[in-house]
Every structure is written in structure tokens, then in C-alpha cells.
């Protein structure tokens, strides 16, 4: 089952991406380096729940 998640910027800008992941194959929290257009740099995005 694929669940929708939110990837929140660790830079504190409030920018986020939405995506989905398979919880069976990836049970741990997701961390990925992506581009933050607010500060125009690549930063680590961490998984958070969609409210």
C-alpha cells in the first residue's frame, strides 16, 4: 500500500514537496536531498505526515 507523504525542508523555509512511498519496502522515515527554491540551494528534506 502506497501512502502519501510530505517532504519538508530542513532549512526552515516552510517549503515542501508531496510524494508517496511504499511502507512495506521502506518502513523507515525518508530523507532526501532536493532543491529548495526559497533559498535556491539543495537541502535535506525530511518526511512528515500530510495533515
From Swiss-Prot:
<dbReference type="InterPro" id="IPR011332">
    <property type="entry name" value="Ribosomal_zn-bd"/>
</dbReference>
<dbReference type="InterPro" id="IPR018264">
    <property type="entry name" value="Ribosomal_bL33_CS"/>
</dbReference>
<keyword id="KW-0689">Ribosomal protein</keyword>
<dbReference type="GO" id="GO:0006412">
    <property type="term" value="P:translation"/>
</dbReference>
<dbReference type="Pfam" id="PF00471">
    <property type="entry name" value="Ribosomal_L33"/>
</dbReference>
<keyword id="KW-0687">Ribonucleoprotein</keyword>
<dbReference type="GO" id="GO:0022625">
    <property type="term" value="C:cytosolic large ribosomal subunit"/>
</dbReference>
<dbReference type="InterPro" id="IPR038584">
    <property type="entry name" value="Ribosomal_bL33_sf"/>
</dbReference>
<dbReference type="GO" id="GO:0003735">
    <property type="term" value="F:structural constituent of ribosome"/>
</dbReference>
<protein>
    <recommendedName>
        <fullName>Large ribosomal subunit protein bL33</fullName>
    </recommendedName>
</protein>
<comment type="similarity">
    <text>Belongs to the bacterial ribosomal protein bL33 family.</text>
</comment>
<dbReference type="InterPro" id="IPR001705">
    <property type="entry name" value="Ribosomal_bL33"/>
</dbReference>
Amino acid at each position: 500500500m502506497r501512502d502519501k507523504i510530505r517532504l519538508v525542508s530542513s532549512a526552515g523555509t516552510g517549503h515542501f514537496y508531496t510524494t508517496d512511498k511504499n511502507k512495506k519496502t521502506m518502513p523507515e522515515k525518508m530523507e532526501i536531498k532536493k532543491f529548495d527554491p526559497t533559498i535556491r540551494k539543495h537541502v535535506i528534506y525530511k518526511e512528515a505526515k500530510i495533515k
